[in-house]
Amino acid sequence: MLTKRTSEKTSPSGKKVLVTRAGDQATALTVALAEIGVDPVVVPTIEIIPPASFVELDQAIADLDQVDYLILTSANAVNAFFDRLVAQGRNPQALSAIQTVAVGPKSAEALFERGVTADLIPKDYRAEGVVALLKDRVSGKRLLYPKAALARDLIPTELTAAGAKVIAPVAYASAPPVDVAKKLQQALTDGLDLLTFTASSTVQNFVDLLDDQDLGLAKRIPVASIGPLTSATARELGFNVIIEPDNSTLEALVTAIRTYFSGTR
């Protein structure tokens, strides 16, 4: 979805676009934005941290021989799960008899880098896509879904209703980075043409990092959101979402941003 733009055709060149992804994940988006001519301004509003406890995840890893499907909904989930798998003395061969579900190409790529090829990738790169893909094939099956601390309950709820046993340990959490508020304020002062948000948590943390005056300034800047859930959060918090790609991928987001700045359809 791209809303209509009333201004004359312009060029992406020199436009300042805020990147709020986690520091170690911002590179791909930053490079892609630079390639279309914009000036990426990187101020992460989120960092990935360990969960409060690994007890549930460790138990799930110990019981891998009972698992039929492994659901990994992001590169963060892939990395958190495999880091813990290795810490527990296991290796990717432990997954050889398990059907792995990767939500989107980035998750599949992260999985491949760990030595595992995704067996299934839903057409819709969201929790809804996982449910649509699996609901008719998981009755009586045991599913492992290593999730983020603030993940929605859609996958466990819907697939349990479909007859599956869903184990959903928290594999990672997120938090606002320390000492980024001043950098964010400076970016706003210097001027930005577009804000990008790639998760609801990046939006909420952005809001939490700013005082009322700076937040008021920020809300006058148009927003590019990676997908409907992030867009809904941004709108609820008072932002003007004008870009949302049809597919929730970084590539689609960058293409939509280029289209927006070019004033073309």
Task: Report the location of each language-model feature.
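Signature of uroporphyrinogen-III synthase
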Residues: 1-265
